[in-house]
């Protein structure tokens, strides 16, 4: 399960995923199956819903290691790859069309992975199970819509 700030409220949790509401925005989140090194924050993936910012399903990834300058981040859902934009420790979806395609792929796949290379050129792969993802996404979207 994910560690959440004290101000966050877990709306729903199932499988590897949880829907979280905090200060006017909602997220569907899961942590990487690979535990991070002791001195590193845990990698995670989140879909953000925030109507005030017109964000409906923005995909955000906290990488396991910082991205190499100018490097690429590939999110592969099932067998379908998506090129994300990234910088430092984070990567993001490229817009509403890609976000809709990612969510659709997540609903039909069993797992996904995020591939990148760090500053030393080492490959970084974070894997996620999608058990509970659709339910968490729907719960986060519904909670956000009620605000």
PLM ranges: what are they?
Residues 6-147:
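A generic "folded-domain core" signal
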Residues 1-3:
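Bacterial N-terminal signal peptides
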